[in-house]
From Swiss-Prot:
This is S100P-binding protein. Residues 259-292, 313-400 are annotated as: Disordered. Residues 378-387 have a biased composition (Basic and acidic residues). The lineage of its organism: Eukaryota, Metazoa, Chordata, Craniata, Vertebrata. One of its GO terms (molecular function) is calcium-dependent protein binding. It comes from Xenopus laevis (African clawed frog). Its main location: nucleus. It comes from the Eukaryota.
Length: 560
């Protein structure tokens, strides 16, 4: 049998192979008797034809083939070329899609079809826009909770406002009310994006600046709750006014106050909300009367550290004189913010020469305001809350308002003068100490270069003689010539003068060393004869093992 293989190269995969079988016998090797049988085997990989599963069904299921390392999923992939690359995958293996005997092969105990359905449901849920129509029932329930004691007519008004017709009217008039805030989903406030809606007070301020082209519509029910809540918000720091908070926070605050449903919010939201302190009935009455004043005053743009509201024209800040006169009267439950006070002062002084700038707080301005009020004949009630002082800091042409609270004891008998004096007394004027001038001292002279003194011999001899004469005069005056030490010194000096070779004991330049005499050189035999001769056996006690080195002609080789 001989087999010949012919390969045809293709671009996609292996080509068809053709087997040629030659039938021959060994007895007749002639080529004429050979039978040529050609068998062509079709390769499915080359033609890319799938087999029919029904024709290939056997008793045993086909073994599962190993997949490649590339992971394929039913969800859209960022690399679509992975499933279309023919060089990487030879064929699509459908054996994994066949139903096996045990459906619990996956860790989730779910089939691949069920997993794909779950993935599609998740994708549809993520891409689905929020359904506002389905949430209308929950919004209506929240609005009914916001008005627990309201009448049936109020509820009908709220439902009419939430109707599509009311929504079209509100869109045509371009107004934003509290009902539009309620129409949003408030069940999951922590996950909501910041609402574009503003509060009624902020829209009122915007309408004042726009010139009154936009009409403000407010709900009577929510306005009632806004008036009740004004007394509770009076003790909050004045820098955080109700216009600073988004409208969603107001709605959540009202629902949490008027209903028993627990509020589920973040710690940041709880910190920004009002504490809800209890107040007396008298303060509630005064608050309800002063609520319109609050809406007018807070319509003035507030000065923040990151804004420049004073750069606007004075026409946008003009208010009627009656509102200014009523707003200057302090109430026990109403506390103006420092930013609104600065805006009012800027309006009153718009036609006057601006005062010189100073780093200290504007304390005298408060005194002038109270005196002008007394001249008009208006009675000023004592303040029960903490007075607010404003410290103005001007940096680079921008004004920054920072409120500072000074605690003052409550005293109903105090007049406005005493309060102004107490507030001014709290301010401590810091006078900068004068700079200490440096004392100009004497400039130290530069040290001269050190040089070796040079003395002439004549001058040295002259100084020596003067010194010697003074010493001799000292000895003669004290009469110490009789002492033995003086006599010895005198004797040594005289001896050294007479005999220059004599060594003076005070002269340490010469030393008297003893010199040993060197003996006369002699031979060894002479030295032996001088020290006892040969009769003295010096090495007689040495053992026989000791032998000296042989010195021929000088010493014998060994003892005899």
């Amino acid at each position: 049998m001989k087999a010949a293989y012919n390969y045809r190269a293709t671009k996609t995969a292996c080509s068809d192979r053709q087997v040629l079988i030659l039938g021959t016998s060994w007895a007749d090797p002639q080529p004429g008797t050979m039978e040529e049988i050609r068998i062509s085997i079709v390769n499915d990989k080359a033609t890319r034809n799938k087999r029919n599963i029904e024709e290939e069904t056997d008793l045993s299921p086909p073994p599962k083939k190993l997949r490649s390392a590339v992971f394929l999923c039913s969800t859209p992939s960022s690399a679509p070329h992975c499933s279309q690359n023919v060089e990487v995958f030879d064929e699509f293996d459908d054996s994994l899609l066949e139903a096996s005997s045990d459906e619990s092969d996956s860790p989730l105990h779910m089939t691949l079809v069920q997993i794909e359905e779950l993935l599609e449901d998740d994708c549809d849920y993520a891409a689905e826009p929020p359904r506002w129509d389905e949430e209308s029932d929950s919004v209506g329930f929240l609005q009914e909770l916001a008005v627990p004691n309201g009448s049936q007519s109020d509820l009908v008004e709220l439902r009419n406002l939430n109707s599509p017709l009311a929504g079209e009217q509100s869109d045509s008039s371009q107004t934003l009310t509290e009902e539009t805030v309620c129409s949003q989903d408030t069940s999951n406030y922590a996950a909501m994006a910041p609402s574009p809606c503003w509060s009624n007070i902020s829209t009122a301020g915007q309408n004042e600046e726009a010139g009154g082209n936009v009409s403000t519509t407010t709900s009577p029910v929510l306005h009632k709750h806004e008036m009740d809540r004004g007394s509770r918000d009076s003790d909050i720091c004045s820098t955080l006014s109700s216009s600073h908070l988004p409208g969603d926070l107001k709605v959540v605050d009202e629902i949490s106050e008027t209903s028993d449903i627990p509020f589920d919010g973040d710690i940041d939201e709880l910190l920004t909300l009002s504490p809800g302190d209890t107040t007396s009935s008298e303060e509630d009455k005064i608050t309800s009367e002063s609520t319109p004043i609050l809406s007018k005053l807070e319509s003035v743009p507030v000065v923040h550290s990151h804004s420049e509201a004073f750069c606007k024209s004075s026409s946008s800040l003009q208010l009627p004189e009656t509102s200014l006169a009523s707003s200057t009267e302090p109430s026990p439950s109403l506390q103006l913010s420092a930013s609104s006070v600065t805006a009012m002062n800027g309006q009153n002084n718009s036609n006057k020469v601006p005062p010189p700038t100073s780093d200290t707080a504007p304390g005298p301005q408060l005194g002038t305001d109270t005196n002008s009020q007394k001249s008009k004949g208006q009675k000023v009630e004592p303040k029960k809350n903490k007075p607010i002082e404003q410290i103005g800091l001007k940096q680079g042409g921008k004004s920054f308002a920072a409120p500072v609270d000074h605690p003052v004891k409550e005293n109903l008998g105090q007049t406005s003068k005493e309060q102004v004096a107490a507030s001014i007394g709290c301010k401590k004027k810091v006078n900068p100490s004068p700079l200490q001038e440096k004392k100009h001292g004497a400039v130290p002279t530069k040290p001269r270069a050190a040089c070796r003194p040079q003395i002439s011999n004549s001058e040295l001899e002259k100084n020596r003689n003067i010194y010697r004469d003074r010493v001799m005069m000292h000895l003669e005056v004290h009469s110490i010539s009789e002492e033995p030490n003086y006599e010895l010194a005198y004797l040594l000096n005289e001896t050294s003068r007479e005999n220059p070779t004599w060594q003076h004991p005070s002269d340490y330049t010469k030393r008297n060393y003893y010199v040993r005499r060197q003996p006369a050189p002699c031979s060894l035999n002479d030295w032996v004869m001088r020290n006892g001769g040969h009769s003295i056996q010096r090495f007689h006690g040495l053992p026989c093992t000791f032998k000296r080195s042989p010195m021929p002609g000088v010493l014998p080789t060994g003892p005899t």
